[in-house]
Amino acid sequence: MNLLASLAMIAAFSVAPVPRAMAADFYAGKTINFIAGTDTGGGFSIYARLIAKHLGRFISGNPTIVVKNMPGAGGSTAATYLYRAAPKDGTTILSVSPNAILGKLLDETQSQYDPTRFLYLAGAEHGTRLCMTFQHSKIRTYEDALAQKAIIGATSAGSPTREYAAWHKHATAAKFEIVSGYKGPPDLFIAMERGEIDGVCGLDWSALKSQQPEWLRQRKLNLLVQDSIESQPELAALGVPTPWRYIADDIDREAVALMVSFQQAFGKAYLAPPGVPAEQIKTLRNAFAGVLRDPELLADAEKLRIEIAAQSGEEIQRVVEAAYAAPRNVVERLKKIVEP
């Protein structure tokens, strides 16, 4: 997997020293709209609300931070708004799925924005995504999914739940029947519990620990596979395999590696629209660097059972640029295997 090194190495991070934010006069008395490009209850919304609770203290002028959810098209609705309509003055920031950023690489007509032109502020977590089934399902291991049909629920086109289920279906020959149209993780959880679906792919491990701690404690979930370049320690201890042993074709392995590496490196990233003055971008990057190592935020994260792994905005910017420089044959194959 020769793509792994370049993208995985970018995922390594260091947090810059945090001077007091500048531009106090600009942010004093202002409101920063913090948009989460998902429904409430999902991992991106949970992280956005946690960070918003503490972020204002790290910006001179102590602006009010208001979180607004803007779901749709796997995050592309919110990204389009940020790119085309949001104020370009540093008062609007976005938390969005990596799929909304990678989407234009897979379909140049898909989005109305150029992901390489966004101004990336920080990252809060390296995501490890999972395929799982509920306790009553006959599909208890990934080997079961290779041998018999599993009904896998998903949200909208372009979402991790749909694209991850699709590439598993095509690259490993998992017998997944994908049912799209669920509103978000809460609806998927209800569908699993009711037996409408066997399970779901593309959910984030850190968010799952916050959303369904009792299910995990009571072992109500069968964790089939962890979509990770290197095995996540907690999941490895639970015996959850990575997907690489199940992918026979070399180009398929490279295509899946491109998506998984990008998703893990990008994680929970935060961005501003192109055109925001450099002074405001510096202020926001410094603020994120500070808040993501703040003891109060980290204590709240522990209560929520979510992980914080800070990255700088500059590192996220390089992650995006590296993905868009990937070999065309790998990109073309990825385009095919993320469609159900």
Regions found by a protein language model. Name each.
Residues 22-24, 68:
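Boundary of Sec targeting at the N-terminus
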Residues 71, 153-245:
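Ligand-binding pocket segment of bilobal, Venus flytrap-like solute-binding proteins
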Residues 51, 73-75, 90-103, 123-125, ...:
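Ligand-binding clamshell of periplasmic/extracellular solute-binding protein-like
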Residues 10-21:
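C-terminal segment of classical bacterial N-terminal signal peptides
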Residues 28-32, 217-219, 223-224, 246-248, ...:
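An extracytoplasmic/periplasmic, membrane-proximal ligand-sensing/linker region
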Residues 33-48, 71-74, 153-160:
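Extracytoplasmic "Venus flytrap"
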Residues 26, 32, 57-62, 81-92, ...:
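Hinge/capping helix and adjacent helix->loop/strand transition within the periplasmic-binding protein
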Residues 62-80:
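Early extracytoplasmic/lumenal segment of secretory-pathway proteins
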